[in-house]
Amino acid sequence: MASEHIWQRIWLGLVLAGSLVTLAAAPLPITEGDTALLGHIARNILQSGEWLTLHYQVGWIVDKPPLTFWLMALSLHAIGDNPVALRGWQLLMSLLLVVVTYRIARLHAGREESLLAALLLVTFFQVFLQATLPGQDVALALFLALAFYDWLHYRRSARPAAAASAGMWVALAVLTKGPIGLVVFILVAAADAIVARRTRAADQAWRWGHVLLGVATFAIVAIPWFAYGYLRQGFPFVDTFLLGGAIGFGRSLQPQIAEALPLWQALLAYVPLLALGMLPWTGVLPAAAQEGWRTLRVGPPALRLCVLWATVYFVLISLSLTDKVFRYLLLVYPPIAVVGARALIVGFNEPRRLRVPAVVTLGIGLPVMAGGIWMMAMRFPQEVAIYLPLVLPFAVTLALSMVAFAVLTLWRPGRAPLALLAAGTMLSFSLLTWVLMTRWEPLWPWQRVAAVVHRHHSPPTTVVIFREKIDLPGYYIRVPLTNIDDVSVLSRAWRGGRTLVLLRNQDLALLPASPPHRMLATMPSGWVLVVND
């Protein structure tokens, strides 16, 4: 018993340490365009005072619901225009998701198992990654987790307050990312009710009056913003937010970012991505799947719901014909953490079972990590020399931690190798944060370049970025930016008047010889800013 209490303190300490590692990522510089895009939209909310119809640029309507933009705008207003304001609110949401995952596990499990569920979630690679990249997915996962938590409470007690609060959380999920929040909740709740009925589980039957209360609460919270959008914009709003666009039902019928994959590839695309996102705990997945299958027949309701939550959502996104996007997987990690923690507790009682995660870590986890780095190198060959040194300290530390876990578990299975792996993972996350904090801005000094642009810009000067999206530089450069991909269009712009151009150093030869260019700024990442005067 004393040993069990000691390990509970160790798991709690590791969860708290993982939370601090997550929060330490708040001051990270902006490293990708989506964060800059969201920040630009939130900034426009504050500047225009328009909180209901959101804009990116004049005339460009945002095709996402408003909740996360509101949160970011409030954060910018409260603490200023800086990276902490851009992502701090989401880091807090990510940690709230860890707490809710712990509470869901606590409905059926002891303290140690629940702490293990929280520890798995806070150290999953993709959960840490997505927490640092502001967007809709962390908020969606949090609100649906809260909805399922209240659903479980309702199935236990049949209290109307639980039905109403579940409806409220689903409404917030819809205000975060559209109909997908409602679809996922209905499918998982329906599957849970069907399985409970078939297995004659002792769950409380719902009452239709309580269901109507939940639906009414959902409608009161979710509908007003959508009704306002329809009244102001008409059918194009319905088409964008409900039928097609980026989040409507039609989005699931065809890809919008890349070409459609062959059917067999589309169906299996998320399998390797899940193995990658679960690092360093990929080895736990087979044991979690085995425990999940057993749970469907004889397990407690909360654990059963987590199995159905992970399974239904994973099947849903796998069958969807839309783009296979890594971040869409985020919603499966809370239930996988809960089921994975149960599998680990079973392994503590039967230590030989822990050898399977060790073998899978060596045979699948490490190759998946190496394959992920190799695929990124193949996809972005020009950037390998820039980004690989940033990633290597993290990757090497994580790989060594996984090897140490596997070797120690094969030698003497138990809790200690798991604690070592969790600590090593946090060290690798900390190294990644430190490297990005110290080395990113010297490579990409966008603030310095923006200052140069502002100093040399005066109407009617044109500012062009060649063969690159404008979102990230556009966050810092406060004058209109034009994106050009075609060399002939670039040549016409260059000869048509005073022009500032951001482009890669190797693309300088594509500029016309007349008028000659003058160098205004260079970046170690290989980009330059030139002007034609």
Which positions does each model-derived feature cover?
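Transmembrane-helix signature of polytopic, membrane-embedded enzymes
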Residues: W7-L16, T101-T123
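Transmembrane-helix motifs of polytopic, lipid-linked glycan transferases
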Residues: G88-H108, L146
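Membrane-interface transmembrane helices that cradle and orient dolichyl/undecaprenyl
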Residues: E112, A147-S165, A173, L344-G347
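Specific aromatic-rich, kink-prone transmembrane helix
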Residues: A139-R156, W169, P335-V339
